[in-house]
Each structure stands twice: as C-alpha cells, then as structure tokens.
UniProtKB/Swiss-Prot annotation:
Protein name: Bifunctional protein FolD
Originating species: Haemophilus influenzae (strain PittGG)
InterPro entries registered for this protein in UniProt: Aminoacid_DH-like_N_sf, NAD(P)-bd_dom_sf, THF_DH/CycHdrlase, THF_DH/CycHdrlase_cat_dom, THF_DH/CycHdrlase_CS, THF_DH/CycHdrlase_NAD-bd_dom
GO cellular component, as recorded: cytosol
One Pfam family this sequence matches: THF_DHG_CYH
Role played: Catalyzes the oxidation of 5,10-methylenetetrahydrofolate to 5,10-methenyltetrahydrofolate and then the hydrolysis of 5,10-methenyltetrahydrofolate to 10-formyltetrahydrofolate.
Amino acid sequence: MAAKIISGTELSKQIKANLADKITHYIEQGKRVPGLAVILVGADPASQIYVGNKRKSCEEVGILSKSYDLPETTTQNELLAIIDQLNADKNIDGILVQLPLPKQINAEAIIEHIDPKKDVDGFHPYNVGRLCQRIPTLRACTPYGVMKLLETTGIDLHGKHAVIVGASNIVGRPMSLELLLAGATVTVTHRFTKNLENHVRQADILVVAVGKPNLISGDWIKESAVVIDVGINRVDGKLVGDIEFDKAAEKAAYITPVPGGVGPMTVAMLMSNTLYAYEHNK
C-alpha cells in the first residue's frame, strides 16, 4: 500500500487563513495589531532563513513583527536588557529568540528570562510544566504542529503505541507530553537507547526528530503506521528527512514529506501562539 501524504503546507495555509480572519476582526473592532518581537543574534544562514519565514508569516496573517538583528558579539546582559524592555512593552505579545545562540550566551537563562505569557516558542519551564500538568497554554510549536497533523488523519490516539526518536527539549520531550495528553502509550528513544530498530518496529505512531539523514530505515516501519518526520537535512543539494521516505511510504498508512510536512506547521503554530498570547495579554 502507498501511504497518504500529510501535507503541512496545506494545513498551515488553512490555519494562517483562520488566524488572519480573526486578526482582521479584532482590528475592525478598533483593537491594536498583535505584536511579535523576533530576535536574531549573529548571522547563521539557517537561522536567517528561519527568521525570514517567521517574519513573512507575520505579514501574511496581520501580525506586526518587530525585528532585532544583533551582532554575533552581543553579550548575555545586552540580550537580557532587550528582553526586559520587551517584557514590559504592552504592544508586544510574543517574544521569540532564534536558537542556537552564540557560545557566550546561556540559552536556558535567556528562555527563562522571557515572560512566560509572551513565550510563544513554548520553551519556558513554566509552559512546559503546564503541559506536564495537563493544563497547556503556550505549547512548543513543533510538537503542537505535529499534533495538528495527526488530527487530520482522524486516528484515535488513545492506546496507540507512539515512539519518539530523539529527546531534545525543543521536540522530543514536549512531544512525549503532547502524545501522553492525547492518550497514547509513549516510548522515547535517545542516543543511549539500545536496539533502536526494535522500538521503531513497534510504533503505531512514529515521530523522528534527530537531524541525521535516513537514520530510520523504511524496512523498520510497522504496517499501517503513521510516520512523522521532523528532521530536515541537506544532502547533495536536496532537503531530506531522518526517515528513508520512499520505502517507509510503501508500508505506512500516513507519512509527512520533507520539505512540506512539519516545517510549515511549526511556523503556523508560532502565529497561533502569538494570537493566543495577544488574546490573553491583559
């Protein structure tokens, strides 16, 4: 059987169109425009592309983006001072600091300094803690986007065995909490996991977020599994995921492509989080 493609490109367009309608409605009522501050430290080419996509999406939905492009030499205290200003700015609803940061800046200290109500990336320990307590508000964008993609399949996740490959703070760990919240039985694998293949073969739902091209053989995929590939890698000038796509697509019921799968959803959920923060910014 050939897997059905879960298109993040299409779903993200629908989500952004709905957000744009809501924002237009607020502005017609005489309310201010939602505001997102985007901070980029240094000139990492990949980060510049990601930030550019986020700013473009802001324009598409009607969010005012305020840009801070800072030099590589920016100190931690200088960045903290900017965050202090943005935390106090009533016209800014969301604050996004593009990761990774230069080595002289402690990313955890920066994330913890952002007002949790403006943490639209969903990385602040307070927001991760709320998800852990089953009362989520601002949720990590990539896992949140994956949950929206899974919803489109119509599959009931209760009791399904979900296997996550990768245990990062940005994807793997919050992803495990999202899937637990949805009623799945969750296994998280990581670099110390023995016999990765055995775990993958048992997955009804497989989410891979490592950043190693074709790490997961298509032969390992369980028949009729739902396969979500979060990885994005450049190989011979082409973008590929962490999963051997063609072979996996022969066995899976549903699969996300790379590009055009999870990536667009991450940005769409950032826009969604920004509107949520705006609506709750009292």
